């Protein structure tokens, strides 16, 4: 499981170093294979261990090609999906189209989301966290049935 948010430098070749604490799990369970794609709702990237991506891929295959909204989700998620492999230094290369889509610059945020990571520009991450906290304080989150059942 991937938890926490960490600032990481993006090198001039477009690589990021995956934090050391995650590498053993990624190597043991996925041989260092990851898939990076865009988030269709947020200005960030989604980084999946290969086994997790294969679950998503099956769900994408089940969407209806003749439904425009479902086809759009398939097109974007699959079209941007890029294989990434941990190198010997624990780095992955983020393709130029992915970096441009998420507006990634020198410092990025790698955010654990339990079964995957989100990759944000530092600026976008700070703005999103502020919006999320404001939403929580406003009480609007309590309108979700799933969240009403969540006990923390």
Swiss-Prot record:
| Listed GO CC annotations | cytoplasm; nucleoid
Keywords, A to Z, come to: Cytoplasm, DNA-binding, Repeat, Transcription, Transcription regulation
Identify the main location: cytoplasm
Q: Which Pfam families match?
A: MraZ
Give the domain of life: Bacteria
Q: Which GO terms describe its molecular function?
A: DNA-binding transcription factor activity; transcription cis-regulatory region binding
Q: Which residues form the SpoVT-AbrB domain?
A: 5-52, 81-124
Keyword Transcription regulation assigned: yes
What binding partners and quaternary form does the record give?
A: Forms oligomers.
Query: What family classification does the UniProt entry report for this protein?
Result: Belongs to the MraZ family.
Cited PANTHER family: TRANSCRIPTIONAL REGULATOR MRAZ (PTHR34701:SF1)
Protein's name according to its UniProt entry: Transcriptional regulator MraZ
- Species of the source: Mannheimia succiniciproducens (strain KCTC 0769BP / MBEL55E)
């Amino acid at each position: 499981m991937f938890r926490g948010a960490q600032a990481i430098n993006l090198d001039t070749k477009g690589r990021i170093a995956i934090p050391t604490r995650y590498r053993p799990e990624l190597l043991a369970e996925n041989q260092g294979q990851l898939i990076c794609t865009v988030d269709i709702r947020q200005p960030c990237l989604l980084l999946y261990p290969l086994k997790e991506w294969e679950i998503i891929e099956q769900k994408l295959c089940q969407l209806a090609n003749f439904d425009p909204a479902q086809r759009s989700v398939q097109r974007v998620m699959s079209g941007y999906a890029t294989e990434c492999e941990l190198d010997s230094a624990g780095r992955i290369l983020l393709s130029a189209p992915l970096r441009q889509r998420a507006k990634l610059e020198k410092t990025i945020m790698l955010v654990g989301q339990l079964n995957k990571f989100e990759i944000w520009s530092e600026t976008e991450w700070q703005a999103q966290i502020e919006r999320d906290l404001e939403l929580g304080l406003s009480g609007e989150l309590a309108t979700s049935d799933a969240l009403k059942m969540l006990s923390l």
